[in-house]
Design a protein with these regions (language model features):
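Short beta-strand/turn micro-motifs composed of small residues
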Residues: 95, 197-199, 335
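Bacterial Sec-dependent N-terminal signal peptides
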Residues: 1-38, 42, 421, 427-430
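Membrane/wall-proximal cationic-aromatic binding patches
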Residues: 43-93, 155-164
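Conserved, compact domain cores that house catalytic/ligand-binding motifs in diverse enzymes
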Residues: 87-93, 100, 104, 255-347, ...
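Conserved SGNH/GDSL esterase-like catalytic core that processes O-acyl groups on lipids
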Residues: 100-201, 205-208, 215-313, 401
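A generic secondary-structure signal
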Residues: 74-77, 282-283, 321, 417
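Catalytic His-Asp segment of secreted/periplasmic serine-dependent ester chemistry enzymes
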Residues: 27-28, 277, 339-430
Length: 430
């Protein structure tokens, strides 16, 4: 009898653990029908872990002028299927190394796709080919050697939509793109590929699978429509001028949903993006962004003294460049989480309070110019919060970058803040 009771208890415990595991693993899984079932209702969401920080402020997007109205309206139409003309909503998140790693943006992407539909992986960058860290859920490989240029070190190689550019002097070059998600096979399959390259100087071919349509509506990109969904494609580039330049790719599957594109460059500042040519901003405009999220400021705080006037000017120039090329987009500024200070080439155990000064300048610009902002600096606990984040093991050893869990938590917080704004819109307008 006692043995049977033990077996029964173990069985129940196993079932409970299995249910919890399935629930957690399915948290970001897209059910193509689920996101339309409560189309005009608010969305209930909260981060998977509720970290407590002593001086944290409410997790909201400050939008006193209701600037996000158009973006939120499109989200509501997308979710309700009430407007057939709105098939996709496009978000472009621009930043530094915190964005390049894609744990932050990757989490926000998964959540947006879960609740509003998954139209594909969107923009991807060939970072590995320049020996830098890659984004999530894709691999780009090539048998050729590529020289590179990026916004911190431009050298004449054209810099494109991803903030970098690759170039080879060979007559031909090959690229393989593979999308991967071990948790959810097929999640990022695609049947449409856009290659960002100089199509005036380069012929582009897809070796497999079969192509049913080719589109060259822009001078800087070529789009291929495939006859089937796939997670693997080989692309061949041929140039009679022995100069092949590429900057990135765009993957989609033809379904409704939110594209969540990320553009991140390690070490980037506002001023680096301002040095980009007009082509960079034109190519961003080709993504038809409904919302641009700007997450910079960490590297601006890694200096001996902050020039407040210059930083304000850099922020203003960047905002102008985005709005000038994409006049119909909404823009959100975010503030950086406090990090630890540098001591020479090493990181000290002292919080870098200059991050707070950068935060103040970003917020000052946003408030004066009517831009919404997400004040992650204070949402994360404000001045001194670095010590709490470090105790919770949310920083890696350099105490400037976060652990994967730390970035995922930021992504959950950002999505929660967007959903709060979305729910306010729904209550006021539906």
């Amino acid at each position: 009898m006692k043995k049977n009771i033990i077996v029964t208890c173990l069985t129940v415990a196993f079932i409970l653990c299995l249910c919890i595991t399935v629930s957690v693993s399915a948290r970001y899984r897209l059910d193509e029908k689920s996101y339309t079932q409560t189309a005009t209702d608010t969305i209930i969401y909260q981060p998977s872990v509720n970290y407590k920080f002593s001086k944290a402020t409410p997790n909201v997007i400050v939008d006193t002028d209701s600037s996000l109205y158009c973006f939120l309206e499109k989200l509501s139409h997308l979710r309700s299927l009430s407007n057939d003309s709105i098939k996709n909503v496009s978000v472009v998140h621009i930043g530094d190394s915190h964005i390049q790693a894609d744990f932050f943006t990757g989490t926000a992407r998964k959540l947006m796709n879960h609740y509003f539909g998954n139209p594909g992986r969107g923009l991807i960058a060939p970072n590995r080919l320049m020996k830098s860290n890659n984004g999530r859920h894709y691999k780009i490989t090539s048998s050729k050697q590529w020289k590179h240029s990026f916004i911190l070190k431009p050298n004449g190689i054209p810099i494109g939509i991803t903030g970098l550019g690759l170039q080879t002097k060979d007559l031909t070059a090959d690229i393989n793109i593979l999308t991967v998600d071990e948790s959810f096979p097929g999640e990022w399959d695609f049947n449409k590929v856009t290659a960002y390259c100089d199509i005036d100087k380069t012929d582009v071919y897809l070796i497999q699978p079969n192509v049913i349509n080719i589109d060259t509506i822009t001078p800087f990109a070529m789009t291929f429509l495939l006859d089937t969904l796939t997670n693997n494609v080989d692309i061949s580039f041929i140039s009679p001028e022995k100069e092949i330049s590429i900057s990135g790719f765009h993957l989609s599957n033809g379904k409704r949903g939110v594209f969540y594109h990320s553009i991140g460059i390690n070490g980037a500042k506002f001023c680096n993006y301002n040095q980009c040519s007009k082509d960079f901003y034109r190519q961003i405009a080709s993504l038809n962004p409904d919302l641009v999220i700007i997450s910079l400021g960490t590297n601006e705080a890694m200096v001996r003294a902050i020039n407040a006037d210059q930083l304000y000017s850099d922020i203003s120039d960047f905002a102008y460049n985005i709005r000038h090329s994409s006049p119909n987009t909404n823009v959100i500024f975010t503030t950086p989480v406090e990090t630890f200070a540098r001591a020479g080439r090493k990181t000290s155990a002292i919080p870098n309070h200059k991050v707070g000064k950068v935060r103040d300048i970003i917020v000052n610009f946003a408030e004066k110019n009517g831009y919404p902002y997400w004040d992650l600096y204070n949402i994360a606990g404000g001045k001194g919060a670095t010590l709490e984040w470090n105790k919770k093991k949310l920083f890696v050893r350099d105490r400037i970058h976060l652990t994967q869990r730390g970035y995922e938590y930021q992504g959950e917080l950002l999505f929660e803040a967007i959903i709060k704004s979305y729910n306010q819109y729904i209550k006021a307008n539906i």
